[in-house]
C-alpha cells in the first residue's frame, strides 16, 4: 500500500510538517495532489483530505464534539466509563486504547481522569492524533486532560506483547474497524468513509484480543456495533448493551477461573 503523502499548505509550519513526516514515515510533497487521499497541514490543524465528496477528517480534543463531551458527557455513568470499570472506582485505571483511531474514546476516558495510552499502527491516524494532542496541550481548557494522554505509534499486538510486568495496563480497550455492511450507517458517517478507506479494516482482531487478554491486569473491553458479532476465539465474561453500540467485557479473573 502506497504511503499517504503530507502536503504543507502553510509555509510557516514547514518544520512541523517535516517533524511529522520523520516521526511517522510519511512522504512530504510540494504540491497539493490532484486526486487520491493526502494529509494537509494548514494554519490550524492537520487534516486527511480527498478530491471526492468526503469532508476533511481530523482528530479534535478541544472544540466541537470534544468540547461537548468534556462539558456535558455524562461522567462515570456513560457507557464507555461503565465498561472500563469507572463507576464507583476509587483508583482510576491505566487504559491502553489498542485501536486509538481518532482518539474519541481515549479522550473521554482521559477527561474522566484515566491515564490513557493511545496505540495506533496507522501512520495517518497516528499523525492526526499527534497533531490533536499538541493542540490540546497548548489550550488551557484541555492541557490537564492531554497530560494524561500518551501516543504510541506501533502495532498493538507487538506493543502489548513487549510490555514488562510493571508496564501492563489495567484495562485494554479495543474498537476494531470492521468492513461496514450497513449502508445507512455508512451514509451517516461520511467523514469516516475516507478514514476507513485509508486506514483499512482490522483483519487480525482475534489475535489482538488474545494479546490484550494476556497483557491486561483487570479487563479487556471490546466496543462493537450493538448487533455485530463478537470477536471469535474467547466468549465475553459480560456484555454491556447501549443504544447503537455494546461493550463485550473480558474480565481477567473470570477468564482465569473459567
Curated annotation (Swiss-Prot):
- Amino acids binding S-adenosyl-L-methionine: 104-105, 120-121, 175
Keyword set includes S-adenosyl-L-methionine: yes
**What SUPFAM superfamilies does its record include?**
S-adenosyl-L-methionine-dependent methyltransferases
Name the Enzyme Commission number(s) assigned to this protein. Answer: 2.1.1.242
Q: Principal localization?
A: cytoplasm
A single GO molecular function, which one? rRNA (guanine-N2-)-methyltransferase activity
Q: According to its UniProt record, where is this protein located?
A: Cytoplasm
Q: Which UniProt keywords apply?
A: Cytoplasm, Methyltransferase, rRNA processing, S-adenosyl-L-methionine, Transferase
Q: Which HAMAP family match?
A: 16SrRNA_methyltr_J
Q: What is this protein's name?
A: Ribosomal RNA small subunit methyltransferase J
Organism of origin is: Chromobacterium violaceum (strain ATCC 12472 / DSM 30191 / JCM 1249 / CCUG 213 / NBRC 12614 / NCIMB 9131 / NCTC 9757 / MK)
